[in-house]
């Protein structure tokens, strides 16, 4: 294929169309030091494999890795033990792709695991039907908002203050492009009573997270009743899927759509990704659900087989009739999720959730005894918020110098809210040992 580069006129026309003054404007979100041309010019022209490996290893050694030091990071990306069998199985050549096969019925193994994935998601969320995965939790949340708009024929989406900021931003982006209204409430979470009062006749749906961004667990039943009384839908987002092994499923509390980030089961944290979006809903909304749905059937010989039952995306049907434009999806991460869940089993999943909660409670009790530290949420799963006597970012930096990954400052996600600067998100999982907790407590006493 002949290479035909864009001309200056082509580039100028494209920049004008999107409202950018220069190519550099496209990279304004990238830190300036990362775009320093002098740093690129200083790179050696070439190097042997050993030299390059040695140089990169030296750079990597400057980082603190979650597996080598006490780690309490969370805020939407949670570190759990992943059985070795998961990685071994997903690297089989038959599975090592993110694609749903175009000749779907030829790939019975892929369709079967997608069917099992859907079954697992429906069971843990307490819903009737689930799709074959979305890109990640945030995009699943955005698709849920768009789905609610289609179902209710209303244009306003209300997002609770406890919704993860990335989920809020992603949802607002999609709604703006579709010409709908997305209202994100202040991040200092409102009581459900206040949120209930905002639900009106123009509300398509209310989106809440449980446990929320700050770690709070709530009974969502009153909110669900208020939404349904107003003709709106309740969308529940779950960032930590392990919580569903212990907490009442959203479906049991009246949710109409449940979305979740599933990468904590089966995948390492990996700088927060890649993710896999879980999406479940009521059967009556099946045909408004985005993405794909794998189904079980019998062939002409009476043997069980699997098919793509629904694919209401623009590559399969007319664009104006499509429910989404999801393309290459997170099928491989969905497979990892499915294998991990299968290895755990129902009893193992529940036990894993109990261990997470117990470790978090033990950690919170120890931290609450540190002078100047207050544990904010009264009810939580495996993550909670600390109010510190000084900016959380400073504390995190000081503890990193002591080889402790203390948690995530809320200000990292919400920098425009100075009243939240002293809040620190702290997470504990089955990998958190009593020694890790003691190390964090001792270090906090030193730096506060």
From Swiss-Prot:
Keywords: Oxidoreductase. GO terms for molecular function: glycine dehydrogenase (decarboxylating) activity. Gene3D superfamilies: Aspartate Aminotransferase, domain 1, Type I PLP-dependent aspartate aminotransferase-like (Major domain). Its EC number is 1.4.4.2. Pfam families: GDC-P. Coiled coil: none annotated. It comes from the Bacteria. The keyword Oxidoreductase applies. It catalyses: N(6)-[(R)-lipoyl]-L-lysyl-[glycine-cleavage complex H protein] + glycine + H(+) = N(6)-[(R)-S(8)-aminomethyldihydrolipoyl]-L-lysyl-[glycine-cleavage complex H protein] + CO2. Belongs to the GcvP family. N-terminal subunit subfamily. The glycine cleavage system is composed of four proteins: P, T, L and H. In this organism, the P 'protein' is a heterodimer of two subunits. The glycine cleavage system catalyzes the degradation of glycine. The P protein binds the alpha-amino group of glycine through its pyridoxal phosphate cofactor; CO(2) is released and the remaining methylamine moiety is then transferred to the lipoamide cofactor of the H protein. This is Probable glycine dehydrogenase (decarboxylating) subunit 1. It comes from Rhodospirillum rubrum (strain ATCC 11170 / ATH 1.1.1 / DSM 467 / LMG 4362 / NCIMB 8255 / S1). The gene is gcvPA.
